[in-house]
Amino acid sequence: MARYGVAVVKIGGSIASRLERVADEIAVLAREGLRLVVVHGGGKVVDEYSRRMGVEPRYVLHPSGVRSRYTSWEELEVYVMVMAGLLATSISSELASRGLKVLSLTGLDGLSVEARRRERIVIVNERGRPQAIPGGYTGKIERVDSMFVGSMLQQVDVILYSPVAYGREGDRVVALNVDGDQMAASLSAALKAPLALVTDVPGVILDGRVVDRIRVSEAREIAAKAGVGMNRKILMAAKAVSEGSPYAAIGDPPIQSLINGEKGTLVTRS
């Protein structure tokens, strides 16, 4: 694979729990001159703090088989507090401790990641039937300000993005929950950079074997056979590649091998 000057890395909540190892890897890559945009997850931590604050987390299943968080206003407050506060600070501290200059952002900063709030969403109800419900405070990303992100990357080693975008309600700008894989895919497409979706499994596994390569045209078919969670990663990787990223890799560390397209499941145009 060709060498790129910028890469986008998504670290899920399970990987973030092994933060020291991840921070070590990111530090090595940054010292080698690679500029990194890192998107973090942390849904389990959000769930933990939601329950502490008396807000029971709610998840919904979509007809596509994708499972997502349902974000009420109360849940949004906890989500932003944990993602953009507690977790972002913890990850930034680890990276800064390794001598890296880190800029921690959400999509509201610089109005850099814009999403459209979903007024209605279709879910699968308890009877297994499609049902439309209010969309809550969840968004679908529609725009990334690549010039802003690119200019910030010239000044730091790592940009750390929490999966929070901004939306508009009349004259008001509001925070919206966006899926971390979606945010990473949108950033990599806008920056035309490789995407590494780092997980705790070696790649997309079907029939007991890691799938080496998925073409964009095959993504929906293969996602339908993958488990909940992995199906979203496949779809978001395909979205990134179809919209500008040269390729995306799904798998476990080392992160550099994923960025180079040397391991995991590679998602490509053809």
Swiss-Prot record:
Site positions for Transition state stabilizer: K10, K233
Protein name: Putative [LysW]-aminoadipate/[LysW]-glutamate kinase
A Gene Ontology biological process term: lysine biosynthetic process via aminoadipic acid
Enzyme class: transferase
Keyword Transferase (UniProt): yes
Catalytic activity: [amino-group carrier protein]-C-terminal-N-(1,4-dicarboxybutan-1-yl)-L-glutamine + ATP = [amino-group carrier protein]-C-terminal-N-(1-carboxy-5-phosphooxy-5-oxopentan-1-yl)-L-glutamine + ADP; [amino-group carrier protein]-C-terminal-gamma-(L-glutamyl)-L-glutamate + ATP = [amino-group carrier protein]-C-terminal-gamma-(5-phospho-L-glutamyl)-L-glutamate + ADP
Family of the protein in this entry: Belongs to the acetylglutamate kinase family. LysZ subfamily.
UniProt xrefs under HAMAP family: LysZ
Keywords on record: Amino-acid biosynthesis, Arginine biosynthesis, ATP-binding, Cytoplasm, Kinase, Lysine biosynthesis, Nucleotide-binding, Transferase
Gene Ontology annotations for the cellular component aspect, listed alphabetically: cytoplasm
Top-level taxon of the source organism: Archaea
NCBIfam families according to UniProt: argB (TIGR00761), PRK14058.1-4 (NF010662)
Enzyme Commission number, as recorded: 2.7.2.17, 2.7.2.19
UniProt source species: Aeropyrum pernix (strain ATCC 700893 / DSM 11879 / JCM 9820 / NBRC 100138 / K1)
InterPro entries: AceGlu_kinase-like_sf, AcgluKinase_fam, Asp/Glu/Uridylate_kinase, LysZ
UniProt function note: Involved in both the arginine and lysine biosynthetic pathways. Phosphorylates the LysW-bound precursors glutamate (for arginine biosynthesis), respectively alpha-aminoadipate (for lysine biosynthesis).
Binding site for substrate: G42, G43, R69, N177
Gene Ontology molecular-function annotations: acetylglutamate kinase activity; ATP binding; N2-acetyl-L-aminoadipate kinase activity
Subcellular localization(s) per the UniProt record: Cytoplasm
Keyword Transferase: yes
